[in-house]
Amino acid sequence: MAKWVYMFTEGNATMRNLLGGKGANLAEMTSLGLPVPQGFTITTEACTQYYEDGRQINDEIMAQIMEAITKMEGVTGKKFGDKENPLLVSVRSGARASMPGMMDTILNLGLNEEVVNVLAEKSNNPRWAWDCYRRFIQMYSDVVMEVGKKYFEELIDKMKAERGVTLDVDLTAEDLQELANQFKAEYKEKIGADFPTDPKEQLMGAIKAVFRSWDNPRANVYRRDNDIPYSWGTAVNVQMMAFGNMGDDCGTGVAFTRDPATGENGLFGEFLTNAQGEDVVAGVRTPMHISEMEQKFPEAFKQFNEVCNTLEKHYRDMQDMEFTVEHGKLYMLQTRNGKRTAQAALKIACDLVDEGMRTEEEAVAMIDPRNLDTLLHPQFDAAALKAATPLGRGLGASPGAACGKVVFSADDAVEWAARGEKVVLVRLETSPEDITGMKSAQGILTVRGGMTSHAAVVARGMGSCCVSGCGDIAMDEENKKFTLAGKEFHEGDAISIDGTTGNIYDGIIPTVDATIAGEFGRIMAWADKYRTMKVRTNADTPADAKKARELGAEGIGLCRTEHMFFEGNRIDAFREMICSETVEEREAALEKILPEQQGDFEKLYEALEGNPVTIRFLDPPLHEFVPTDEEDIKKLADAQGKTVDQIKTIIDSLHEFNPMMGHRGCRLAVTYPEIAKMQTKAVIRAAINVKKAHADWNVCPEIMIPLVGDIKELKYVKKVVVDTADAEIAAAGVDLKYEVGTMIEIPRAALTADEIAKEADFFCFGTNDLTQMTYGFSRDDAGKFLNAYYDAKIFENDPFAKLDQVGVGKLMKMAIELGKPVNPNLHVGICGEHGGDPSSVEFCHKIGLNYVSCSPFRVPIARLAAAQAAIAEKNA
């Protein structure tokens, strides 16, 4: 019989695939002898089974759950559903990868009207008993029955207003009892049935709800962004309650062993007295700093410090812990490797190496390459910042600079950002439902919540700027406005926020490019030491090339020459070429562009200082270059000595029904060989000039023919290139080597790579087009149906962002396996956008690519991902 349920005493940290991160770590803390309230974990396999069984918990799993409850009763001396000595539990999710706030939690399960009355009497603390019950009704209604939290929050706010108090803790036992009754009435009105009183029914409902939350919209978005497969499922942890809300000698907190924003070594966190754990994370009350716990609970704080040291040494990483103090006694509810900003990740990794806890290789493997992106984000201009006066200040919860127009809802943030507006999302507090809006916003500002609130944790994970807990803001969400320092801000007004200092400014403060910190250099040097694959960049201008070189690029893997045709007056000459009727006319027009292209290439070679440069010849269909407005059409007609109607006829003739599969790429060079001749002259002449100026540089142009699907196409265009290049080199009397290769972006090219490799010096996978043609859908139109594919679980990722290793990847592997035996000197790279995606880089390493090429700002990501792939392979 399959084992679906494990007691905490039966597991350990190595079982995270089965028990989820939270369950595995609770088991590990139990084995370390730490004070963990006992319980059990229902496995991730049970979650998968739940979905296979049509979202039902089968009898076998249910029996094992009830058996585990009986074991818990034996350990705790309490009884589930008993009036006199009830066992109350929490039910929490726990996937194998940490997903803060994405799935659901229920506390105080096992309560009903009878039990709460006995608890109130026996504990001599009716306020605590009714507080637990009203929280349970609210959480169960929201999580299990999907009755929105807001209905209950409105009842709480109404009650506080009537009682003239501002905080939940100021409500009396009688108030909370009345609230519990109001909550049950609300539940009955929304659901049409009484609130469940049977603890077993409550438990099964809660477990189902946690399994169900694996498939909620916010979890799906988070998984897609963080490469977490749907098939993993989530575990469920059922744990005896420890109560932080029994009075002033109780409390709850969240703490990190190091600062998750900066990486500084020292306890960082927050604490609330007389509260339950969700209060800290949800950001409903703004908590006190963890250091204040020492005055309140000296013994528990001393023990907590020891636990922190034990856990960090044990896991050899910064830990994020949840804990509760019940009548002065410490209970550990969770530990996990803490989410951190990119800046903190680098510092922590370097410090752990310096402290002897980690090797260089382990430090490189610890860092999520995607987060490096945020280090290269702009910061506020120092002079402008100095001149600006902050209107107010919150907590600098996630570093960076953000400015934009104020919006008050996640939906508005998505909508405004979609039309190109930069926005700052301003909320009372964020909830997990806000994740899409948080992604779309430049930054997040909240009125409530601390450094460990949902907004702070998620923003740090996404690399977004966040200021939380600015209590000076008077918020009016309904009318979409807030007031700060006497000034009223409406939707669309501009503000700037500083996620490092927590300062809030009126208007837009200019930003400057970020400078790269010392730890960044150390980690990158280690990455370069261990990686075996080269990293190039996709760059069309000397400025891009220079930036990429600063960020560690070792060459250009793709220079798109068509972008150069749009510079200055060149477009006029190119349009003349398109509208010419004879070869001579076309050559005359191209002759005007030749010196300009040559100059561009010289600047690129100079910027690359002898490192390889791959130049792709003209690729887009000609219709992309022709004029569309009347003035430009007339200008072209005059230059050509033609009528406007004649030019319009030529433009109309270029129209294609499917231009991305039409007259483009090498097909242009076959139709108009003079274009390939001109581009070859420009490439070779530029290389000759730069080689003369820098004799010590290894200048070897790589000419790339796009969209080849047949060996005969490549032969035809290559002959034009080689004849032209050899003539130029002979005329100059120099010794210059060059290479002619092709892009593999048509499936047929991959299937016949053994033929193509006979003529090509190199292959470069153009995975944007290869993905498009393998799937048979357009990159520009896929957005119309991809969301439906995600919802239907057909796709988990956008195949244009994350390489499809099963189909497109198989074609790539096939091309290499066919091509290399025919041409052992064949070098192979990738230059699609996938070249900067970590999982795609890892795949490229596995199938033996020589290099990846990506946009300049993704170069550090690719360097780190390439190193991680090499380290993983070595340690496999």
Residue ranges of predicted features:
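Conserved alpha/beta-domain cores
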Residues: 92, 516, 526-876
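A short, small-residue-rich loop immediately preceding and capping a beta-strand
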Residues: 442-448, 466, 829
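Nucleotide/phosphate-binding sheet-loop regions of phosphoryl- and nucleotidyl-transfer enzymes
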Residues: 1-387, 421-424, 431-436, 442, ...
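Protease-associated
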Residues: 357-440, 503-509, 520, 524-528, ...
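Short beta->alpha connector loops at strand-helix junctions that form conserved
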Residues: 40, 447-449, 468-471, 559, ...
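Residues forming the flavin
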Residues: 462-464
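S4-like RNA-binding module at protein N-termini
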Residues: 64, 472-505, 510
